[in-house]
């Protein structure tokens, strides 16, 4: 199993042991879910179902939970997906509110960029953020992403219509800034 790590966090596949931490830190947090595509979870039984779905998804996709190195606690999730020959997109990116403002989001995004450009040899990384999610937009811009386009999207679980802003980073720009 691949484990990716940076100074303060690491990524690895989920396990049922992480259910309570993900429920408390992410899935039940309405402030986080308002910018995400998952429905907030209201009880531990639903969190167990969500974790089983996450584990199943991660078996055939590049999805991970994010862990705090100091505590080994699950504090978020992240993933990338192949969208064309050598283009990749983030498939979700989230850090628990209690861990925000510590630079973990940037460490997380840089880990994903390293996976896409250094390991998978991708040409382009696509990042999407809900219009108004200034923390997410500022994060991708701080890593060199540039605005590409916008589209109106309807979130499935609550039929909420929003504008999804799309940002891109090319391998050439990544390698000139962070290259290995």
Predicted regions located by residue number:
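Hydrophobic residues in alpha-helical segments
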Residues: 26-27, 36, 55-58
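Acyl-donor (CoA/ACP) binding surface of acyl/acetyltransferases
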Residues: 1-21, 25-29, 67-180
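Short, hydrophobic secondary-structure boundary micro-motifs
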Residues: 34-36, 63, 177-178
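Generic structural signal for secondary-structure transition and capping sites
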Residues: 31-32, 56-59, 121
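Conserved GNAT-fold acetyl-CoA-binding loop/helix
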Residues: 31-53
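A short helix-loop-beta-strand connector motif used in the catalytic cores of GNAT acetyltransferases and
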Residues: 52-65
């Amino acid at each position: 199993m691949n484990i990716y790590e940076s100074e303060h966090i690491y990524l690895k596949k989920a396990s049922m042991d992480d259910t309570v931490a993900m429920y408390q830190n992410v899935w039940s947090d309405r402030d986080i879910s308002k910018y995400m595509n998952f429905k907030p979870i209201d009880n531990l039984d639903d969190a167990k179902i969500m974790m089983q779905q996450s584990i199943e998804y991660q078996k055939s996709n590049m999805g991970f939970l994010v862990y705090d190195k100091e505590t080994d606690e699950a504090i978020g999730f992240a993933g990338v997906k192949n969208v064309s020959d050598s283009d990749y997109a983030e498939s979700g990116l989230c850090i628990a509110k209690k861990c925000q403002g510590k630079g973990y989001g940037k460490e997380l995004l840089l880990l994903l960029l390293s996976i896409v450009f250094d390991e998978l040899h991708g040409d382009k990384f696509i990042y999407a953020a809900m219009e108004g999610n200034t923390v997410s937009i500022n994060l991708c811009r701080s890593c060199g992403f540039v605005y590409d386009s916008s589209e109106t999207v309807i979130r499935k679980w609550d039929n909420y219509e929003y504008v999804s802003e799309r940002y891109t980073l090319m391998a050439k720009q990544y390698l000139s800034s962070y290259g290995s």
